[in-house]
Amino acid sequence: PAALAGWQFSRRPLRGAGPVLLLVLSVAMGMLAIGQSASWNRSQSDQADFGSGASVRLVGGQGGGPATAGIYGGLDGVRQAAPAHRTTVEASGGRTAEILALDTAHADEGMLMRSDLAGGSPRRVFDAIAPEPAPRPGFVLPKDGTRVKLDLRITTVSPKPSGSAVDPDEDPPVVTVLLEDRYGLPYRFLAGPVPVDGRPVPVSFAVSAAGGLAVTGIEVDDEPPFGQAQKRRVAVSDVRVVTGSDSPEGSEGSEGQEHPVPVSGSVRWDASMALAERGDSRPGEPPVRNGTSGLPDFTYDTGVENDDDWERTTSTLRITAARPKAAPLKAVATDDYLKKTNAKLGDEIDLTLAGNTVRVTLAESVRRLPTTGAAELSGAADPAQYGGALLLDLRAVTEVLARRTTATIEATE
């Protein structure tokens, strides 16, 4: 049959040209369609990776309480979670620049950044802005803890109280417990009023088992007494953690076992006193640490209220765990940012983060940063007013802001 077909084609060569050309055209169009489909799918995948920066991206805060700290990292099926804080700042020429502070140590997918955008390995870009590893401040709670319990007491040291230890007309000091999760994000728990009578006041609050929280200090807000300053002693003692609770929020009715939290005597604490009067703030007498137990224990001077002032003076005693000196902040800039701000690598710039001005060094540059550049995210109504983007390490940012009493930063995604 093959020989016969060949003989027929040789007798009439043009009769088979049409079917052959049609077959070739069909194969070519099929290959073109396959190539276009693969190219389109790859393009859509690249755009999706650039827009999300991770396999799953969740935009929106998780709440500011210690009971929700690190909650996404504890969900079933989640291998790793990296918090981020996104904001915008004014750039030169009325432009709007995008700022992304990301926990690069836990962003193990590298923002899904392509090597052609990073100019090499994306990990090299992250390493350029990551801080050096450092021990965590304060005392770290056990991983499976769902509730923290501790005792607070405030005692008048001098002058010694006569009669009733507590003046019923005076409002007691209000204490706030300061915490920090494994990402360096700060949390606050309002413990409430603590009478100045020397008796322990029990404090109990829920924490997230997935947060890796550490107690990093306390704040005592008060009003100085009239006529005469007092020496008072504030101390934290008997810190315990509840484990094995059946309730995800660690409620009182479903508690498990209590365990003491080990506190090393090597933990150091710093304390400062600030007095606010008529809108002005001034430092008070430096508090004095008592003992070496590893828990906050300080004697402080309350200051004195002037009878002639119609506006009450307020005081804040802030006790925080000692930290090593924060490393200088570094940033990765997009080519767009460098071009539109006339900046270059090695320049130092000032940025406003969480209401505080921080100094940042431009350490690396990339063509573009994933998750940045969209008008609805950058805040620039006109694309021409977009001023590029900067990437910072969230841990490095929180280390700098931790030393500023007015700074609070939250994860926005």
Where in the sequence are the language-model features?
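Basic-flanked hydrophobic alpha-helices used for secretion and membrane insertion
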Residues: 68, 86-91, 98-413
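Juxtamembrane segments of multi-pass membrane proteins
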Residues: 2-134
